[in-house]
């Protein structure tokens, strides 16, 4: 696939959702979400596959991506694996891994990205922790060989900004959007906080991650331009001043 999740990444939970799951996800996509992780691992494969087909259709119109939790990609090409395994990871277009400490990060081999959790105390998994906090998150991101999504208890714009400041290339969100009275508005609010914090003036993103533009379809390179050039990586540098210019 050639890119890693960034921005606001939505994790599904049909039991927490305030409406039908596909409708909640569609609203979040309207609010700017472009990455969705399908959980619902308790469903029979046939039902989960049907749900994956529906969610892929929702994401297709905006160039979004569905990632499936677990080793079975459900006829897709992107999975998110638990810390427990399998190892080595399957050969697919995009593979993520849940991590919680430096030892688990050290086990990464060919994964494309990782989540680190819990960043903050979470209502979804009460008592799960202890929470890393922004500083703990920063320390682990520094040691990570791959881009990192912050996960766990992220519900406010300030928390999103703290994660970006710690070096996260995205924030994985469940309850804040699933339980929201207006999932689209919540997704927009959190996405705006991410974009503001992730501007080039405030931080440099991990070189293999993309920062999505909320509400826009993927950009197609035009003549004389490239995605690499527009992202800032590989951009021509200004000429070095001569000795005379420096005097």
Over which residues does each language-model region extend?
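Non-cysteine beta-strand/loop elements that form the S-adenosyl-L-methionine
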Residues: 112-120
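Conserved N-terminal beta1-alpha1 strand-loop-helix module at the mouth
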Residues: 1-78, 88-89, 95-97, 102-112, ...
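N-terminal amphipathic/hydrophobic targeting modules at extreme N-termini
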Residues: 215-221, 225-239
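A short acidic, helix-capping loop that chelates divalent metal ions and anchors anionic groups
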Residues: 120-126
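Charged helix-capping and loop-helix junction motifs
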Residues: 49-53, 129-137
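Intrinsically disordered, low-complexity polyampholyte segments enriched for Lys and acidic residues
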Residues: 210, 234, 244-245
């Amino acid at each position: 696939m050639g890119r890693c999740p960034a921005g606001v990444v939505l994790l599904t939970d049909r039991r927490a959702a305030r409406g039908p799951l596909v409708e909640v996800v569609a609203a979040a996509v309207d609010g700017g979400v472009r990455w969705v992780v399908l959980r619902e691992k308790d469903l029979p494969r046939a039902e989960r596959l049907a749900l994956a087909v529906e969610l892929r259709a929702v994401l297709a119109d905006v160039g979004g991506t569905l990632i499936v939790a677990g080793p079975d990609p459900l006829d897709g090409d992107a999975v998110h694996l638990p810390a427990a395994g399998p190892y080595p990871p399957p050969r697919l277009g995009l593979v993520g891994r849940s991590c919680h400490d430096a030892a688990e990060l050290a086990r990464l081999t060919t994964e494309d990205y990782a989540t680190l959790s819990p960043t903050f105390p979470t209502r979804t998994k009460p008592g799960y922790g202890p929470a890393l906090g922004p500083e703990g998150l920063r320390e682990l991101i520094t040691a990570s060989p791959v881009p990192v999504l912050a996960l766990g208890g992220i519900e406010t714009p300030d928390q999103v900004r703290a994660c970006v400041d710690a070096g996260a290339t995205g924030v994985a969100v469940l309850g804040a959007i699933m339980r929201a009275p207006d999932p689209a508005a919540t997704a927009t609010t959190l996405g705006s906080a991410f974009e503001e914090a992730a501007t080039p003036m405030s931080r440099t993103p991990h070189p293999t991650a993309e920062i999505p533009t909320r509400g826009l379809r993927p950009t197609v390179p035009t003549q004389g331009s490239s995605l690499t050039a527009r992202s800032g990586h590989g951009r021509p540098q200004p000429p070095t001043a001569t000795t005379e210019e420096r005097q």
